[in-house]
Design a protein with these regions (language model features):
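Basic, Gly/Ser/Thr-rich N-terminal segments that form RNA-phosphate-binding interfaces in CRISPR RAMP
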Residues: 1-375
């Protein structure tokens, strides 16, 4: 006995292969610090720093803990986590995610292993996106939004509800572990802004009117009877039977020197039985804090959107395609797509700076700064 009040003893498995070691023992006067020291020792002993991708860590090497805590003052011993029951969650999940955040930033003059790799991969993706734009341009795509940059004005969490052993998730590149915003999400929020602009212009307010407008925009065929704004929306974003002419690219971050990328947040559901077991909500239930990983405020993302000129030309050659829609395509061509570029920039900017993207936007997450700049 070394005189410290709390003793944590047990094993930690990182993943289902290897990384299993003899019992680890940690002592401290504070239970929380004893747990943190226990996990630090397990991390160092396992040589887990050889894993350079957060995605790989989350997919294959989430820690499984089998340990007990002894209170030498009260002479009591309790199970912290057990292989026979829950083996990660609560404070162990927080300790694990804190370690991920720690390894994703500078400590003193030393960069964490994840920080080095994410910064390196962000440079690679900057090059890959540039090459992707060039290749698409050679395939008759017009660049409508060219590497425009917006900075997060609040925490960002895309993919929070995706399946994950940690209960919550964050969209990361499946190989390189770099956070990004999927193109499908960007297209969705831009389309949403365009939709509500049309609804406002047409003075559609009731639920029934909104539902009919949705059907007209997403289910009905492109027709000469459609108004100009509705035709533009269908041409750009598509319908059930027509592929839209806009192409959104995934948005990747531009990591600055010494910039922290991630930080933890917590949500605290108060009625666990109501949400998970269909029970009546009651004040007698204990709050259930859930720690989750987010992209930090102040991270710059780069956005790119292109227009399919090849298919637009085919539309103009199609004798059966509605003439009113052809006229819109011709007008875009005549002004060099400048009007189209302005519309797309406005939709995306309004979506990201006013409504947000990802999870928990009603609570202010996923909002970007108003300033758009270009490389």
């Amino acid at each position: 006995m070394n005189g410290k009040r709390f003793k944590v003893e047990g094993k930690v498995w990182f993943g289902n292969k290897g990384f299993c070691f003899n019992s680890i023992v940690s002592y401290d006067d504070k239970e929380e610090r004893a747990k943190e020291d226990f996990f630090d020792k397990a991390w160092k002993s396992s040589n887990i720093d050889i894993i350079e991708s957060i995605s790989l860590l989350f997919q294959k090497y989430v820690p499984v803990i089998d340990a007990k805590i002894e209170d030498t003052k009260e002479k009591q011993t309790k199970i912290w986590f057990s292989l026979k029951g829950e083996s990660i969650g609560g404070d162990s999940k927080k300790i694990f995610l804190n370690k991920v955040v720690e390894k994703s930033k500078f400590q003193g003059n030393q960069p964490g292993i994840f920080y080095e790799k994410i910064k390196h991969f962000s440079k690679i993706f900057e090059y890959r996106i540039r090459k992707q734009r060039e290749n698409l341009k050679n395939q008759q795509y017009e660049i409508i939004l060219d590497d425009c940059q917006l900075k997060t004005a609040s925490r960002l969490v895309v993919g929070l509800g995706a399946g994950n052993v940690l209960e919550t998730s964050l969209t990361l590149h499946h190989i390189f572990g770099i956070p990004y915003i999927p193109a499908s999400a960007l297209k969705g929020v831009a389309r949403m802004v365009s939709f509500w602009e049309i609804a406002e212009k047409l003075n559609k307010k009731s639920d029934n009117e909104i539902e009919k407008l949705q059907k007209q925009l997403y289910d009905d065929e492109i027709s000469n009877s459609d108004g100009e704004d509705i035709l533009k929306h269908k041409l750009l974003f598509g319908t059930q039977n027509f592929k839209g002419l806009l192409v959104f690219l995934d948005a990747y971050p531009e990591i600055q020197d010494n910039q922290q990328i991630f930080e933890l947040d917590v949500m605290t559901p108060h009625y666990q039985g109501y949400y998970t077991k269909n029970q009546v909500p009651g004040d007698w239930e204990n709050p259930n804090p859930i720690v989750f990983l987010t992209v930090k405020k102040g991270i710059t993302f780069c956005f790119n959107v292109l227009f399919d000129k090849y298919r637009a030309e085919k539309i103009l050659e199609d004798k059966d395609f509605p003439q009113n829609a052809k006229d819109i395509v011709e007008n875009w061509q005549k002004n060099g797509y400048s009007n189209l570029s302005s519309d797309v920039k406005k939709w995306l900017k309004d979506a990201l700076t006013e409504f947000g993207i990802g999870a928990k936007t009603r609570l202010g997450y996923g909002i970007f700064d108003q300033t758009i700049r270009k490389n």
